[in-house]
Amino acid sequence: MKRTTIKLLFGLALLAGWLGGAAAQDVEASDMVRGGLQVIQLVDQGKTGELWDGAAPAAKKRVARADFMAQISKLRGPLGMPLQRTWVAINRQVVADSDADLAGQYVSVEYETRFTNTAANRASMRELVSFHMDRDGIWRFSGYVLR
């Protein structure tokens, strides 16, 4: 557990180093794609609790740690492991909200993924990983959606 936490913190520190302090329009797409893959690899490995621990305050306000872990497990478990994953889009958005933790810049990276247990491995799913630039100027994980 301690080793996993250290790896997660190191990965998040690398992500923060790549992305920290930059305005959304200045963020390199390749950095966001790499950061998104780091997040998804934690999901692949079942390390969603550790992922939630390093998430943006806005994400933690929306869902409790146990609920986040249960929701991801319920969605991903039946699909099996990924066979192929390709990023397909990066979206940027500025959100105005009276809650300072929710307001601000968001970047989402969308991946097309085929899993071992999906209709003869032919059907692909979309995974969306979102990041929020927190008030301290550091990009942090803020969401994972599977559709």
Predicted regions and their residues:
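Short solvent-exposed beta->alpha transition segments
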Residues: 33-34, 49-108
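Bacterial N-terminal signal peptides that target proteins for export
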Residues: 1-10
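Exposed beta-sheet edge and beta->alpha loop/turn motif
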Residues: 90-147
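Internal amphipathic alpha-helical segments of the cytochrome P450 catalytic fold
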Residues: 48-49, 138
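Second-shell loop/turn segments in exported
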Residues: 25-26, 37-41, 54-62, 116-118
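Bacterial N-terminal signal peptides
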Residues: 9-18
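Short, low-complexity N-terminal intrinsically disordered segments enriched in polar/charged residues
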Residues: 2-3, 19-45
